[in-house]
Amino acid sequence: MASIKEKIAYALGDAAAGGIVWKVMSIAFPLFFTNVFGLSFADAAVLMLVARMFDVVTDPIMGSLADRTQSRWGTYRPWLIFGSIPFGLIFALLLYTPDLGPVGKRIYAYSLYLLMMAVYTMVNVPYGSLLGVMTDDDNEKNQFSAFRMIGAYAMGFATLLSFPYLQKWIGGTNAHQYAVTGAILGVVAAIMTMVCGLLTKERLKPVRAEKFSFHQFANLFHNKAWLYMTAMAICTNFFNGFRYAVAGYMFDYCLHGSVTVDDLIINFTVFMAFGEVTCMVFGGVAPWFAKKVGSKRMAFFWSAVFCLVTSVAFFFIPMDSAYIGLMIALVILTSMGIGIYSPLLWSMYADVADYHTKHFGTSATGLIFSSGTMSQKFGTAISGSLIALLLGWAGANMITDAMGNTSIDPASVTNSVLIMVWSLFSLFPAAIALLLMLLAYKFPIKK
């Protein structure tokens, strides 16, 4: 039986990866790259698409490599221990705006973003795989997953809530604020990742892992449960990706900037932080809810139903800051559903890994969890790319100043652009939630 101390240590891993690094990449990077760093919509969209093609190769290789690692620290833990420092350092560098021309900035952004994705894979794939070797008890897997999600959402809440206040405290230009904030958060992420690697335990020895081959990866397509799980993971990250990536544009253009309510500065990061704390609370409810409705897949199904209803309702709120309270209320309600299905997702991946070992006779834990990480990055990045492309399609144009920096032309933000932004936060996620319902209902593992 694992101790509370170990479960908290495990939670720190996703507090760093999900609550800091991925949260900032999801919600702040689209706006940062176009409005601060100076990339065009097209450059930002292509950057994320290129990174996804890169991940298609690196993620499964990393999963197989992690499965075959043998060291004094175990199979998966050394990747967290020794990957923690480059993880935090590269994240910090990615939020720095160098004094370069347009071409130099493109090279810097593309190089650092791809490197960040590689290091994220190097740390997060073994982290996810840890769940398969820390315990073989299904209920305890759910508990570890719940701790993981609580850690991620608690840190996500702290990150998003503190973001505008950190920037205000740092002062200076937007570029300087992002750079210093990135350095602070990078240090915190590195420390959390290292502590996670040092204080967790691998109690189970993985079943023999085959040397990686693309044939081995192709064999996953014979695993029906893995196919459903991959589709569900992509959809959950599409759902979250649309909402997080467009939130900054929604505040800038639909609500005309930050909203102040009783001295509380509500910008796009604080707005989404209300959802983070809700997810944190309901992440702890997920194991109980799964028992209540009879299975993980049905808990997933009903949480997707809730997300569908609340997302559609958000579309009908007027684009007026006077309704900020109602907007926050619906973000909280939507996050109740997200908070329930998020920990179940990773617990279900552990079930898929067990299913694969039972039916195929070899361990593919790292490979299967790497596909989960790849799905996470694929869904988030493609949604970010689509947002950039759809805003351009709706009529938003970029202008270039005398220094070669690009930004959105305010004159191009027409009513069609505003409706597109509003829909990307509400109707697009609603359609994804509908697909999630169907996939969860048909998921073949019933426990």
Give residue spans per PLM region.
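Membrane-embedded alpha-helical bundles of multi-pass transporters/translocases
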Residues: M1-K447
